[in-house]
Amino acid sequence: VTKSARARRAVVLACGGFPHDVARRKAMFPHAGDGTAHFSPGPVGNTGDGLRLAETAGGRIEDTLPNAAAWVPVSITERKDGSKGVMPHFIDRAKPGVIAVMRDGRRFANEGNSYHDFVQAMVKAAKPGEEITAFLLCDHRALRRYGLGCVPPFPMPLRHHLSTGYLKRGTTLAELAD
């Protein structure tokens, strides 16, 4: 069955984007370097098939937008089977007692900003050619009260997260930086 759709100006295609299409990420995100610098909590099968299908039918992807993605800060976890998990930090950075810093130890954004604005600030604060990485810092009390990322609040133990390196513990900022 053939169906037609007509539009006066544009069609918005909601097909999940292209979080796991390395070539398109490289083309659309100037800061992405080799295209592998982004981790997405989106399904790994979400490789932009819908966009490519639309392009074969004559569709055009708007590539002049200042932001071609919905950015979200994530952390990477290692699962028991050795595969990697991607943990989105939608609200973690805005929890009481949490601050975010770049590798140089400097705060770069208001942690309460939207996750999209937060990641834009993180990208802007990174030095050219440097991996875009930030760290969420909190004290023991905040961690146990609110949790952080894949670390649940008290009474769940912290051992696993400390042993895998997902959490780092130190009594000074210098210890945390090691």
State what each model feature region is.
Residues 51-177:
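An anion/pyrophosphate-binding glycine-rich loop and adjacent beta-alpha core
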Residues 6-77:
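Glycine-rich loop(s) and the adjacent beta-strand/alpha-helix scaffold that form part
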Residues 1-5:
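A structured beta-alpha segment of the ubiquitous adenosine-cofactor-binding alpha/beta core
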